[in-house]
Amino acid sequence: MKALKPLLLFCVALCFATSCKKNPDMTLVQKTVYENNDLSMFHVDDGWEVTFVYDSLNSFVELEYSAYLEDYVSVGEVNEWLNFDFNKQIYKQAGSVFKATVHISQKEALYIRADNASIITMEGHFEVEDMDFELLNASICKSFEVTSQSCGIELSDGSQLYGVDFHGTNCTVYAHKESVCKGCFNVEQTFTTGIGINSQLIIFGGSMPSASIEVKEASTINMAEVEIKDMSVYLDGGSEATVNVTETLSGFLLSGSTLYYKGHPQIDVDCSDDSTIRPI
């Protein structure tokens, strides 16, 4: 019994210490920073939720986060990029808030990169000459309305981009490692895309005179709702594409891939024995 007494005292002390442990302060802290800025490059990291708002009159950043994160929030400029991050690894309590709203006025160029399960929202229609948009490592964006002369979109590692409404001169879309892109593309000149490793690109509507698509490693593209004059295709690794072409359709099908096409184009496609091209 005497031997058990120290153990019992230790257990009681441990329970007391646990019960007295303070819960984190979840009070919301709100700040306005970077007023009247000329920033055009934004890096969103570590699960931050950032909303970009087109604002023709003002440019500033509103921050909102749980008070216990005060010493860990890291929002600042690094090499012309405005970073939304934390300065060290920290366990984030359930219900924690760490988000920002970025008001952006008219820009010639806009670069947005989201990493590590961050969430992007874009409110309003953005008009820029040059747009570069990246979603990395399971990041998400559910609205993307952009008019741009040149636009580059890149998704990787399970990232998702929905609600695309693009109007512009040229556009490229790359999606890799189980990523998904869905929306409408109105392209005046050339649309180029590369999709790989179980990824998807689904285009619900729009227009484009020419397109070049590369689909690999069991990935899927569906462009049946967009009538295209000239298209080149490269399908490999059991991939699948559905297209709508009016004049010329050229390219290669390899390793058990399948190409479905609408329209009556002139076809010049090299097809491996285990691949298939079919009209619909």
Segment roles from a protein language model:
Residues 1-30:
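Bacterial Sec-dependent N-terminal signal peptides
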Residues 20-136, 143-156, 162-175, 184, ...:
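Acidic (Asp/Glu) and glycine-rich low-complexity loops/linkers
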Residues 164, 172, 178-280:
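Short, surface-exposed interaction patches in beta-rich subdomains
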